Amino acid sequence: MAKRVQLVLNQDISKLGKSGDLVEVAPGYARNYLIPQKLATNATPGILKQVERRREQERQRQLELRQQALEQKESLEKVGSLTIAKQVGENEAIFGTITTQDVADAIKAATGQEVDRRGITIPDINHLGTYQAEIKLYSDVAAQVDIQVVAS
């Protein structure tokens, strides 16, 4: 079996790994492609310590983000229900629909917190009534909020 060299990736490379990963590759692949293109660095003890330090910092940052998401979830669920007023036509049908941006604006008005509209999941809202919205705050943290649609 041919000798393999250990490298630390500087960038994400499909089929090989993510930035900061320790990988073993053929010496020619490392010497002719990865190192000249600055996609990887030789895995020296100093570089390995640096990578481990970066991983620990990233782990701490992710823990802090998750904790903030949990606190935000708690405050969102304390609000209870959000009220959104829309113009109404026949049969209590609203003009237009309620969008995720409308929900994000209602959350900001009620709590003062910014919520990314891309993390909000709502059903199609075309009539007056009460609906449930799910707000994804972190990969495993989501808040449930009631939306009350009323006539303006």
Curated annotation (Swiss-Prot):
Keywords: Ribonucleoprotein, Ribosomal protein, RNA-binding, rRNA-binding. It comes from Nostoc punctiforme (strain ATCC 29133 / PCC 73102). It comes from the Bacteria. This is Large ribosomal subunit protein bL9. GO terms for molecular function: rRNA binding; structural constituent of ribosome. Pfam families: Ribosomal_L9_C, Ribosomal_L9_N. SUPFAM superfamilies: L9 N-domain-like, Ribosomal protein L9 C-domain. Belongs to the bacterial ribosomal protein bL9 family. The lineage of its organism: Bacteria, Bacillati, Cyanobacteriota, Cyanophyceae, Nostocales.
